[in-house]
Amino acid sequence: MQPYLDLMRHVLDNGNDKSDRTGTGTRSVFGWQMRFDLSQGFPVMTTKKLHLKSIIHELLWFIQGDTNIKYLQENGVKIWDEWADENGDLGPVYGKQWRRWETPDGRVIDQITQLVNSLKNNPDSRRHIVSAWNPGDVDNMALPPCHCLFQFYVANGKLSCQLYQRSADIFLGVPFNIASYALFTMMLAQVCGYQPGEFVHTFGDAHLYSNHFEQAKLQLSRDTRPLPTMWINPEVKDLFAFRFEDFRLEGYDPHPHIPAPVAV
């Protein structure tokens, strides 16, 4: 996970101090890219422990098109609690845009089903793209999408993913995003008949909140450890049939968790 640590160090040493929506203050850079070869292990932090259960359940929740936190809460995942209304609703966030993008003429587009079909039937297409950034819905979302657009690429029997993230909370959010999209790529590779290739992570505003500086320095002081491997149930061939029990992280030996406050 050296590319992630390099980004964190670069922002601490060279970033611009800015105000932000939450009033916390950030240090940020604009424009950065990291690459992870998924054949070299599952890209999850080893310099601090991550709550993988939350990552898997959130991804399954996205894929099902859900926008209410009930499923997450039932499974002990609290990462969206601060943004939900009294009924648990978040508005037309990721799941809505991925699975039910509404067009001006009244049609509904299931971008994920379209993606699976195009990866299977037209692998060389340059249109394997899913967008969560819908200008017509942004104002009604509890939180506009941070990881807002991704594209897939097939070459030599391998499936790669590039994510564009407009806004990136480096300490708390980015480790989740890396693991989530790496896992999503592996799931799609399995159901579409490919091997996992690369996960390419491209950032707009990549920032450390000012109340995460000391935690970031602690993480940078720790040695990296070998990456674990992710077992995925090979019997599952339908993207929408995956369940939490179909995943198992093997050989994960991280340093202890580092607590940090969430900027809301």
From Swiss-Prot:
Belongs to the thymidylate synthase family. Bacterial-type ThyA subfamily. GO terms for cellular component: cytosol. (6R)-5,10-methylene-5,6,7,8-tetrahydrofolate binds at H51, D169, A263. This is Thymidylate synthase. Pathway: Pyrimidine metabolism; dTTP biosynthesis. The active site is at C146 (nucleophile). It catalyses: dUMP + (6R)-5,10-methylene-5,6,7,8-tetrahydrofolate = 7,8-dihydrofolate + dTMP. Its EC number is 2.1.1.45. It is an enzyme of class 2 (transferase). The gene is thyA. InterPro entries: Thymidate_synth/dCMP_Mease, Thymidate_synth/dCMP_Mease_dom, Thymidate_synth/dCMP_Mease_sf, Thymidylate_synthase, Thymidylate_synthase_AS. GO terms for biological process: dTMP biosynthetic process; dTTP biosynthetic process; methylation. Its main location: cytoplasm. Homodimer. It is found in: Cytoplasm. It comes from the Bacteria. DUMP binds at R21, R126, R127, R166, S167, A168, D169, N177, H207, L208, Y209. Catalyzes the reductive methylation of 2'-deoxyuridine-5'-monophosphate (dUMP) to 2'-deoxythymidine-5'-monophosphate (dTMP) while utilizing 5,10-methylenetetrahydrofolate (mTHF) as the methyl donor and reductant in the reaction, yielding dihydrofolate (DHF) as a by-product. This enzymatic reaction provides an intracellular de novo source of dTMP, an essential precursor for DNA biosynthesis.
